Amino acid sequence: MAYKRVLLKLSGEALMGDASYGIDPAVVQRIAQEIATVVQDGFQVAIVVGGGNIFRGIKGAAAGMERATADYVGMIATVMNAITLQDALEQLQVPTRVQTAIAMQEVAEPYIRRRAIRHLEKGRVVIFGSGTGNPFFTTDTTAALRAAEINADVVFKATKVDGVYDSDPKLNPQARRFTTLNYNYVLNHELGVMDSTAIALCKDNSIPIVVFDLFGEGNIRRAVQGEDIGTTVGGSCEVS
């Protein structure tokens, strides 16, 4: 299946490369190059980026911070990643806008749904930073929410693995990779696709989710073009 308007969910950890913290410029440039190719192909691209390479709210809470405060710090981390990715894309002459749910007018536009859609219609990449703007919500939930708001055809979750497995493939060499799954199976079996709120949002709005390996050469383009890579989660999908 080919798509027109897509939402790409990037984890903050994906921007680290082989480092244990921060941003690897070479990785960001490679991701930007792939996104640029997709834009040149005529697709409308929105992006939600996490902040776990800099700060993760739930870990901060576990270390003694108030959870809401820790989540706000994590939201700010996502903006750092969003601006970094924007810079890499604009160096490739890809017009890009960052919109944030928390006002940061010196560095980003406020999130306005109609403006975001207009940017996409004009061929600009839109990167959504600072999550939903509310604590206790993950960036996976942000991806599902923004996808519904902008009428995206699909959510692509780019990860370090090539799909969804029935157990951890690092611990179990016999782990089975699924090709397709339905929302209810994912929710009932608590598979680590996205958190349950994000899955439920996609289910309620009939938005398919494609989980694929970000680091396979050309995988972003292949996924957007509708090739069968990774695992697809959808309402009509059989478990296979």
Swiss-Prot record:
Subcellular location, principal: cytoplasm
Any one GO CC term of the record: cytoplasm
Regulation: Inhibited by UTP.
Binding site for ATP: 9-12, 52, 56, 159, 165, 168
InterPro entries: AceGlu_kinase-like_sf (IPR036393), Asp/Glu/Uridylate_kinase (IPR001048), Uridylate_kinase (IPR011817), Uridylate_kinase_bac (IPR015963)
Keywords for this protein: ATP-binding, Cytoplasm, Kinase, Nucleotide-binding, Pyrimidine biosynthesis, Transferase
Name listed for the protein in its UniProt record: Uridylate kinase
Organism phylogeny: Bacteria, Bacillati, Cyanobacteriota, Cyanophyceae, Synechococcales
